[in-house]
């Protein structure tokens, strides 16, 4: 089920992007980041198995929703002859960061002494995504307004 939900949310993100103007693409980072962070906070605070499952799955959906925005933003900003290289660099940096998230979560869990505390790392990552997406959204809207 988690894989299918992730696949579906990535597809939904792509469909939404197809209906948006290019300068609106960061909206998915803002909304997806906020909803993922809220889902993870709810997960951390919940103790009922059904709610835990629901919040984990909802975090997965909102995380996946953001995926399609990455190549869309890169295509909008990168020079036409460098889109593939730009995406490769961004994807590589993202993979390196993602590789350290479980380690960082484990360090937080060990220092605080609870499993749920480790999920705060995911909350912070999504707050950063929300803020960066918001700044990118403002920047892209300003650029679109100037060129219009």
List where the protein language model places each region:
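Intracellular juxtamembrane helix-capping segments at the cytosolic ends
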Residues: 65-78
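Helix-to-loop junctions at the C-terminal end of transmembrane segments
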Residues: 10-22, 109-110
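Cytoplasmic membrane-interface "Motif A"-like loop-to-helix N-cap segments
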Residues: 18-33
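Multi-pass alpha-helical transporter architecture, strongest
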Residues: 43-44, 120-148
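Hydrophobic core of transmembrane alpha-helices in multi-pass small-molecule transporters
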Residues: 50-65
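A membrane-interface helix-boundary motif in multi-pass transporters
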Residues: 107-126
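C-terminal ends and interior cores of transmembrane alpha-helices
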Residues: 34-47
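A late C-terminal transmembrane helix in Major Facilitator Superfamily
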Residues: 77-112
